[in-house]
Amino acid sequence: MAQRDTGGRLGAEFFTPGDSSFTAFLAAHRPALLSTRGLLPDGVRAAPDRVPHGTTVLALAYRDGVLIAGDRRATMGNLIAQRDLEKVHPADDYTAVAFAGTVGLALDMVKLYQVELAHFEKVEGVPMTLRAKATRLAGMIRQNLGQAMQGLAVVPLLVGYDLAARAGEHGRIFSFDVTGGPYEKTDFHAEGSGSPYARGALKKLFHPGMSRREAALAALQALYDAADDDSATGGPDISRRIFPVVSVITEDGFERLPESETEDLSREMVEQRHTRPDGPTAAM
């Protein structure tokens, strides 16, 4: 176990050569800090109505990069556990992660992933490639497989701006299964309980070369459709002024859209739904 010596200095393990993975360091010296490593007792499964779960997140590539968004609802069974949960987080300057699944484990995984990327860059002197970032996150998901099989799954969605990609291909999207299998997606993807409805909406609305405004509206429309058919997904809450989180990554780095911009776009979308409740149709 990592500890300080009696003189208040760091222990020898902090100066022992090893790889650049902070997760591997914790596993070797402080495994108790890795919440995704433990298993429930044999035969015990998590009760879904006792643990908050995040629901729908999505991403789509657009003209200047990639957009990632998520609704704000967390549920415990048929109860709303939280109305303003933030499921979209920057991982570093050019990468972001959103999650669906068990909230407590997901938030721990996101924080550890942020440290993992920063630690690698400090040790190696260069940032990871985007593919390596996806592989590293896949490994962290795989470490949670035991708990996932007992009902405590975390399913993240990773997006990044690939500085080394060809023009028009900078925005990249990766999804994962509960075993840690990484899958690069083309154009758009969604995860969580409302994802079938969100993907259906994005199939209608997505087109190459979308502007930031078009991409943001498409994401909001998709989340609205998901909330319309999936009770675990939250739509825009006009009365409480709680709206989806929408962020973009471009050559300038990660940016979360201001609340005022997201609110204006959400209100515009809801107003359009007054005359067309099922939302816009696909362009012919």
From Swiss-Prot:
One of its GO terms (molecular function) is threonine-type endopeptidase activity. The keyword Hydrolase applies. The formation of the proteasomal ATPase ARC-20S proteasome complex, likely via the docking of the C-termini of ARC into the intersubunit pockets in the alpha-rings, may trigger opening of the gate for substrate entry. Interconversion between the open-gate and close-gate conformations leads to a dynamic regulation of the 20S proteasome proteolysis activity. One of its GO terms (cellular component) is cytoplasm. Residues 256-277 have a biased composition (Basic and acidic residues). GO terms for biological process: modification-dependent protein catabolic process; proteasomal protein catabolic process. Its EC number is 3.4.25.1. It comes from the Bacteria. Residues 1-54 form a propeptide. Keywords: Autocatalytic cleavage, Cytoplasm, Hydrolase, Protease, Proteasome, Threonine protease, Zymogen. Pathway: Protein degradation; proteasomal Pup-dependent pathway. It holds the Pfam family Proteasome. It is found in: Cytoplasm. Residues 256-284 are annotated as: Disordered. It is an enzyme of class 3 (hydrolase). The active site is at T55. It catalyses: Cleavage of peptide bonds with very broad specificity. PROSITE patterns: PROTEASOME_BETA_2 (PS51476). The 20S proteasome core is composed of 14 alpha and 14 beta subunits that assemble into four stacked heptameric rings, resulting in a barrel-shaped structure. The two inner rings, each composed of seven catalytic beta subunits, are sandwiched by two outer rings, each composed of seven alpha subunits. The catalytic chamber with the active sites is on the inside of the barrel. Has a gated structure, the ends of the cylinder being occluded by the N-termini of the alpha-subunits. Is capped by the proteasome-associated ATPase, ARC. Belongs to the peptidase T1B family. Component of the proteasome core, a large protease complex with broad specificity involved in protein degradation. HAMAP family: Proteasome_B_B (MF_02113_B). This is Proteasome subunit beta 1.
